[in-house]
């Protein structure tokens, strides 16, 4: 029976490194499920693997233009193609990354909520731009009290929840419960890497300094030159908003580093809680050695 291995966890938890080791030992192919590492214009700021440094096949990295609003459904289609190709080669597909929506779509399947009409999508976006996050959030929970579970800074999910209740009159959360969903694959193993938080926070801080010392500033300058709207997903990758503020003389580089590091640490903190709440039956590992021991037994 074909197996699919999923390695996820908070940002900077070491997912990429351990996935390479597992792939080397198990004739594997690494397939990306990070929603920002898909964009080809921002390999440094999104910490995409340096493919010239490994002989392991990597798929779905840096293959979408940042000028495109790429959906979860599109990614699922691309993922299926790569998975089935891996099966035909008798290799182990190793899906790795930390994007919650991508992981959820694998484990629980895609939502069957009807497509949103273009005029509702446009009106919702205009309203969001006018009100800003907090006021828009307040308006949303008036219409859909269940949406209180969302964070007011998660603009993508706020917009999605508002669009759905505007079009259907029903909460997106209610629809997700009512509409039948099933996993993308029949046989998968979900492993979540959760190192000690202080270890992850230090890696986050060090990684951003390393990016600044490389050519990440030029990378963001090139991104700005494409005149991409600020609400496009690529523009929200961790560190990009802060570097843009620096490049537009709104804050110093020191302040940009401080804010970017703090925001990314806060994101990692939320990820720890989210993974445990969303996937209580997953296999959780604090150390890479623990995970490697399990994999060696599972796939020997």
Curated annotation (Swiss-Prot):
Keywords: ATP-binding, Magnesium, Nucleotide-binding, Transferase, tRNA processing. It is an enzyme of class 2 (transferase). The keyword Cell membrane does not apply. Its cofactor is Mg(2+). Signal peptide: none annotated. Residues 34-37 are annotated as: Interaction with substrate tRNA. ATP binds at residues 9-16. GO terms for biological process: tRNA modification. Substrate binds at residues 11-16. The record marks 99, 121 as: Interaction with substrate tRNA. Its EC number is 2.5.1.75. It catalyses: adenosine(37) in tRNA + dimethylallyl diphosphate = N(6)-dimethylallyladenosine(37) in tRNA + diphosphate. Monomer. Belongs to the IPP transferase family. This is tRNA dimethylallyltransferase. The gene is miaA.
């Amino acid at each position: 029976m074909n197996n699919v291995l999923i390695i996820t966890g908070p940002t900077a938890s070491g997912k990429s490194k351990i996935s390479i080791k597992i792939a080397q030992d198990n004739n594997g192919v690494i397939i990306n499920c990070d929603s920002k590492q898909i964009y080809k214009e921002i390999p440094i700021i999104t910490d995409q693997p340096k493919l010239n440094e490994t002989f392991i096949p990597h798929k779905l990295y840096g293959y979408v233009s940042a000028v495109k609003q790429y959906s979860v459904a599109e990614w699922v289609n691309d993922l299926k193609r790569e998975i089935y190709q891996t099966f035909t080669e008798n290799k182990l597909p190793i899906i790795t990354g930390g994007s919650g929506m991508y992981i959820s779509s694998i484990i629980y399947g895609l939502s069957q909520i009807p497509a949103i009409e273009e005029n509702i999508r446009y009106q919702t976006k205009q309203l969001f731009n006018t009100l800003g996050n907090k006021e828009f959030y307040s308006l949303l929970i008036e219409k859909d009290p269940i949406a209180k579970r969302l964070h007011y800074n998660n603009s993508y999910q706020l917009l999605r929840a508002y669009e759905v209740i505007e079009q259907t009159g029903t909460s997106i959360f209610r629809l997700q419960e009512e509409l039948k969903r099933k996993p993308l694959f029949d046989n998968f193993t979900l492993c979540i890497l959760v190192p000690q938080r202080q270890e992850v926070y230090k890696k986050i801080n060090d990684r951003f300094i390393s990016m600044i010392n490389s050519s990440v500033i030029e990378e963001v300058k090139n991104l700005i030159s494409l005149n991409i709207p600020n609400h496009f997903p690529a523009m929200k990758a961790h560190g990009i908003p802060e570097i843009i503020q620096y490049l537009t003389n709104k804050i110093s580089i020191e302040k940009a580093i401080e804010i970017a590091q703090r925001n990314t640490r806060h994101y990692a903190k939320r990820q720890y809680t989210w993974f445990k709440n969303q996937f209580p039956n997953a296999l959780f590992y604090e150390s890479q050695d623990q995970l490697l021991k399990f994999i060696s037994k599972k796939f020997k």
